[in-house]
């Protein structure tokens, strides 16, 4: 059957597929738009799976926070060219809002969940077919206030609202929402993106990571031939510097270069007349 060119254009606009593929789909489905979309989806999936072995070195981080909930995810692509494609950006924003509604930090579960009449995983593979590159959802994060407080966010290298090359969410609890607290939360999110902490506190830093570092430092100090009492002080000093690099609460605030984050929380709490604490944070970045 002859397919009207405007119908072909409409299907192309909806799916992002090529003109020839859209024409073929409509002809195979007797002009039925919904069936043609499904036809393209199935055809696209087979193409995309062939790309799934390729490395993803680029992409975008998407973040969405509203009220007492925040969501963040990392969507990978092979090149920056595709990462800046409108379809890729739209997918990332749609997925992060879907994660916001899904309400659980579970990559596997979210990937299997419903999205736009399909599954998240299938939508990603279909997008890969249209974009011509491997597309991978490599990480999801979800945070929620458990009491009075605020969720702050920051996007670095922003290409559009809520999308960039790195982003962070931070949950501040202990005081009622205020402009001052919200501004402070954003500053902390900016610090997190810049300083890239591996853990919130020393207690939450992986014991394996700490043990490996302590063993390395001990070997280095042993080579100095110092008395045990002196060597132990050197080890503890170097471990403290290690924690100041790795642990958020021990880091020096990048905006003033002198105040530790844990001390900054005390200062802000005194200003707001409420004890303020960081309940959680999430950070994703494109390497």
Swiss-Prot record:
Matches recorded under SUPFAM superfamilies: Elongation factor Ts (EF-Ts), dimerisation domain (SSF54713), UBA-like (SSF46934)
Region called Involved in Mg(2+) ion dislocation from EF-Tu, residue ranges: 79-82
Main location as per UniProt: cytoplasm
GO terms, molecular function: translation elongation factor activity
InterPro entries, per database record: EF-Ts_dimer_sf, Transl_elong_EFTs/EF1B, Transl_elong_EFTs/EF1B_dimer, Transl_elong_Ts_CS, UBA-like_sf
Cell location: Cytoplasm
Gene Ontology CC: one annotated term: cytoplasm
Entry keyword annotation includes GTP-binding: no
Keywords carried by this UniProt record: Cytoplasm, Elongation factor, Protein biosynthesis
Coiled coil: none
Protein's job: Associates with the EF-Tu.GDP complex and induces the exchange of GDP to GTP. It remains bound to the aminoacyl-tRNA.EF-Tu.GTP complex up to the GTP hydrolysis stage on the ribosome.
Record protein name field: Elongation factor Ts
